[in-house]
From Swiss-Prot:
Part of the ABC transporter complex UgpBAEC involved in sn-glycerol-3-phosphate (G3P) import. Probably responsible for the translocation of the substrate across the membrane. Residues 78-269 form the ABC transmembrane type-1 domain. It comes from Agrobacterium fabrum (strain C58 / ATCC 33970) (Agrobacterium tumefaciens (strain C58)). Coiled coil: none annotated. This is sn-glycerol-3-phosphate transport system permease protein UgpE. Pfam families: BPD_transp_1. Belongs to the binding-protein-dependent transport system permease family. InterPro entries: MetI-like, MetI-like_sf.
Length: 282
């Protein structure tokens, strides 16, 4: 039985409040800065109260302010990031799910060897993989394309490993029942594995969507056309703007808008996490 200790509860709540402040203050600071002019932002000390240019900054950023700075509209930057993040998340889940399904439920020569070949890629540094991958993308003519931005990032040894470990916990009785019912591999996957894996898929989707949304190095390498830049690349280019002083008001507006899609994904998928905690899957 857990004892009710008032002091312990107070300390726990204080730690929780402190954690919330540490996480939320940079976002609040960015939002406040997005309501000010660039001169107000760089003039110390910056006020912690909202400024008078909130609607003007967001309107100007959306209707051409960002485009004048980086050569591409804010809407296009957000769209590119959304396409890249969604394609990477879905691609990783589909490929990893099918790979783990084949490794666990099919009997073919060297299947464990293939699994360890996939798993060992986790030990390779990004620098080792990125140069040959870039060479392949150049040879295939995929520079400045969505395929070049997403295809090399779709394979995931981590997701394959997680799906494999989950599939190994599937009771053998379910597999035998499917065989008795004359269910083929596709039907077994559709009717049994997918329903059982929905919370795992939801959790991975959130993680992988954020992973795709925050990509910086790979989009920087494979995009030369500003119209193919993602929101992260756009932010970097605004900060490095050299024709005049950095437009910090647009930078802050873009940063706030860049936060919204990942937050929406987390909020929309949250009930699947709760469902996974309170329900028995098998």
């Amino acid at each position: 039985m857990i004892e009710n200790r008032p002091i312990a509860r107070v300390i726990a709540h204080l730690m929780l409040v402190l954690g919330i402040i540490i996480v939320a203050f940079p976002i609040y600071y960015t939002f406040i800065a997005s309501s000010m002019t660039s001169n107000d932002i760089i003039r110390p000390p910056m006020s912690l109260l909202p400024g008078d240019h909130l609607s003007a900054n967001y309107t100007e950023a959306m209707v051409g302010g960002v485009e004048r700075v980086v050569g591409v509209s804010l809407e296009r930057l957000l769209f590119n990031s959304f396409v890249v993040a969604l394609a990477i998340a879905i691609g990783k889940i589909v490929i990893s799910f099918l790979s783990a399904f084949a490794i666990v439920f099919f009997r073919f020569p060297f299947r464990m060897g293939f699994f360890w070949m996939i798993f060992i890629t986790l030990m390779l540094p990004v620098e080792v993989r990125i140069l040959p991958t870039y060479k392949v993308i150049v040879d295939l003519g995929l520079i400045d394309t969505y395929a070049g931005l997403t295809l090399p990032l779709m394979a995931s040894a981590t997701a394959t490993f997680l799906f494999r470990q989950f599939f190994l916990t599937i009771p053998g009785e379910l597999v035998e029942a499917a065989r008795i019912d004359n269910a083929g591999p596709f039907r077994f996957m559709r009717d049994i594995l997918l329903p059982l894996s929905r919370t795992n898929i939801a959790a991975l989707f959130v993680i992988l969507f954020i992973y795709g949304w925050t990509q910086y190095l790979w989009p920087l390498l494979v995009t030369n056309d500003a119209k193919m830049n993602t929101i992260i690349i756009g932010l970097k280019r605004m900060v490095d703007f050299t024709d005049a002083s950095t437009p910090w008001n647009y930078v802050m507006v873009t940063a706030i808008l860049a936060i919204i899609p990942p937050v929406m994904v987390v909020v929309l998928m949250q009930r699947w996490f709760v469902k996974g905690l309170v329900e028995t899957e098998k």
